[in-house]
Amino acid sequence: MNSYFHSSSNFDLFYQTNLGSHSVNEDSVYISEFKITFSEDDTKSYPAAITVLCDGMGGLSQGDFASQTVINHVRDAVQGSFIDLEDFDGQIIKNAIQQANDVILAHSSQGGEKVSSGTTCVVALLFPECVDGDFSGRYVVKVFSIGDSRCYILRSADSSYRSESAASLGRDVTGMAYERLTQDDSLLEFYRQQKAITKVKLPDGKLVFRVSYKDFRRDYVPAELLRLRSSLIACVGVESLIEPRIQEITSILEPHDGILLASDGFWHRLDHVTTWCRDILEGDEVHVYLGELMRDFISYGERDNLSASVIRVRSSAAVQEVSHV
């Protein structure tokens, strides 16, 4: 188990991982706060934050190498440049993921023997919203995703903003709202998007889900259909050009809102936790809480590695003078 906690005047940062029933943790997580300017000539810098979560593919070899490679490339891309929002279009993140993909593919071919290696990737980058050249008090969140690791936005009771492009919306039993921003790159989600799944009652009374897509047709019992969510149609490290497959979503975080990244080992059973949104937004030791949830999920039968990271927005933002060299 690996955990992290950091709190500043701007953000609370947490993450937690658990091996599950595996001997190797193929998940990798990165989280950090840094500084950003609105333009190259700006004399002030503002707080920003990033978290990255990668789930190395358990069905492929060396998933831990693949996930850590993506983390390293995204981290180095952000740390290696003092980002200004005037020029930022997300390409720096996409390029880093594509470069990591190239490294993983090259590594897989070393020694003349092809070895399959891959990973999911979800990145959340938070930076100040600029209105008429000044910080508005809200944060823009840019999310980049490929695979089935998820990004959720958690809304405080005072938050008025709702994402227009959320994949799904919900509330926990306390009334706290959350939005899932990312679409899973899974076969199940693909069939759902294509409206290819219908519920059918067979003559013997058995209930099945019929998948009909082009020339393919098959009936699945509920447990079989659920397994399709683990069949990925896109990830890092399997094909040469992945940049066009990377989802990019933009939303807004207000003070006291939060963001959660989760591997499938963590989100599989998240809906069974009735107060998770409130507990993450309002809890003091969220990394400890995430660890408790992971142990509960394992006791309920989860076998995969489990990982989650959280960024909570605090109410103030520290502005610093910038020295341009």
Task: Give each language-model segment a name.
Residues 1-325:
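PP2C/PPM-type serine/threonine phosphatase catalytic domain
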